[in-house]
Structure formats: C-alpha cells, structure tokens
C-alpha cells in the first residue's frame, strides 16, 4: 500500500494498487473509492468482499487482472469516519460533490 495523501487532520489515506505483472498501457484501470461518505459503513464490507475476490487467484480474478489494473482507496474520508459524520468531511463538506475542487489545503482528500 502506498500512502501519498493525508486527510485534513493528518490521517493517512492509503492507496492500494492491484495489477498482474507490470502496470501496462492498453489495460483498463478501475479506480475504486470506499468510505467517501463516512456513514456508509456497509461499503467497507462490500469493498472487502470485492478485494477478496480480485485477490483470490481464481480463474475469474486472473482473467480480470489480465485486462484491468485497480487503484483502490479503501477509506477516502477517515476524518469523517472518526468524527461520526454521515456524509461530510471534518470540514463539513460532501467530498462526493467536490471532485473538481482546487483547494488542496481544505480538501486534501480530493
């Protein structure tokens, strides 16, 4: 896992890169985000099940990884999770609505 970003409060936001062999041009890349809305805890369970399947080594997962790389952020909004917020970050913003935001000081998660 890489940690390339921190949340507003300084918590690490890990990034998991899953690929078979070298990351290659011409392959699809799926970008998967979990816990963008902190109150949607069921998303963590779905993401874990999905990762278990992708990493299972089964025929399906091997075929999938042959054609697609994955970049996974298991918890995009750790501040909101710890604060007990339902939809918002520590700053009170819904990160789902701010992907075009340019303010990396107040919205480092994006």
Language-model features: where?
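Non-catalytic propeptide/linker segments at domain boundaries
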Residues: 1-3
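Active-site/substrate-binding loop(s) of hydrolase catalytic cores
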Residues: 6-19, 24-110
